[in-house]
């Protein structure tokens, strides 16, 4: 049943960080959550060509800080920082509080599940054969140091009348191992035959010891019971 659970969700707090790190009271929680959703929706639509990996949102003291992880930071920043300033103003208007935008570059996009899935989707939309696109993505990931990768596509593959799923795997992808650093993402390709879904799993190795925050909290174990004399 390991394939039934979301690989990122089950590892939150163990080896995976959250994409939103803030605390709110009961009356503010819904507004903050709705604001996060609208900010992500806006940035995703605005930065379609920027190879967007993920968006991390923090809310320190009546403000919002957005970190954009992208493989093409120059596209996000724009000429002399004009584009990022427009994004900052738009995010501040959506969230209703002062905004700060940071850009983080993804050094190896071939090892990022979201970017790999988006790359396969763009190839399928350009009518590249799905098997060739999958194999190329798998080979690039393994060449750059991935321990394992699995790619699955589903839909009307090659324009077939009946939809089906096909997957390709190389190396190890241990979904049951919680300390395994597995990056998972979904993407979709809009072709003339319909929508093709793409799932990507990338195994980058095991993280021993867990996250630093998890290590800081020591488990409170029960004190060992004293044995009575004459008993073993």
UniProtKB/Swiss-Prot annotation:
Record keywords: Ribonucleoprotein, Ribosomal protein, RNA-binding, rRNA-binding
**Where does the source fall among the domains of life?**
Bacteria
| Leader sequence residues | none
Q: Where is this region: Disordered?
A: 213-232
KH type-2 domain residues? 39-107
Spell out the PROSITE patterns in the cross-references.
KH_TYPE_2, RIBOSOMAL_S3
Per its UniProt record, what InterPro entries does this chain match? KH_dom, KH_dom-like_a/b, KH_dom_type_2, KH_sf_prok-type, Ribosomal_S3_C_sf, Ribosomal_uS3_bac-typ, Ribosomal_uS3_C, Ribosomal_uS3_CS
Has keyword RNA-binding?
yes
Output the Gene Ontology cellular-component terms: cytosolic small ribosomal subunit
List the SMART domains.
KH
- Please provide an example of a Pfam family that matches this protein in its UniProt record: KH_2
Q: Which GO terms describe its molecular function?
A: mRNA binding; rRNA binding; structural constituent of ribosome
The free-text function statement in the UniProt record for this protein reads:
Binds the lower part of the 30S subunit head. Binds mRNA in the 70S ribosome, positioning it for translation.
Q: What is this protein called?
A: Small ribosomal subunit protein uS3
Q: Which organism is it from?
A: Vibrio parahaemolyticus serotype O3:K6 (strain RIMD 2210633)
Q: Lineage, please?
A: Bacteria, Pseudomonadati, Pseudomonadota, Gammaproteobacteria, Vibrionales
Gene responsible for this protein: rpsC
């Amino acid at each position: 049943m390991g394939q039934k659970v979301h690989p990122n969700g089950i590892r939150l707090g163990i080896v995976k960080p959250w994409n939103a790190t803030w605390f709110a009271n009961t009356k503010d929680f819904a507004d903050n959550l709705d604001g996060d959703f609208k900010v992500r929706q806006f940035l995703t639509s605005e930065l379609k060509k920027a190879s967007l990996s993920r968006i991390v949102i923090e809310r320190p003291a009546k403000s919002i800080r957005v970190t954009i992880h992208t493989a093409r930071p120059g596209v996000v920043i724009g000429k002399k920082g004009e584009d990022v300033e427009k994004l900052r103003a738009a995010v501040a208007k959506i969230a209703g509080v002062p905004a700060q935008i940071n850009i983080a570059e993804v050094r190896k996009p071939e090892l990022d599940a979201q970017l790999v899935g988006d790359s396969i989707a763009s190839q399928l939309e350009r009518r590249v054969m799905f098997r060739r696109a999958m194999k190329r993505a798998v080979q690039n990931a393994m060449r750059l140091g991935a321990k394992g990768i699995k790619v699955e596509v589903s839909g009307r593959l090659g324009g077939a009348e009946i939809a089906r799923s096909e997957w390709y795997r190389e190396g190890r992808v241990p979904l049951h191992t919680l300390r395994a650093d597995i990056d998972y993402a979904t993407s979709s390709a809009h072709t003339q035959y319909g929508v093709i879904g793409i799932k990507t799993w990338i195994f980058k190795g095991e993280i021993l010891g867990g996250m630093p925050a998890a290590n800081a909290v020591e488990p409170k174990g029960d004190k060992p019971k004293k044995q009575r004399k004459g008993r073993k």
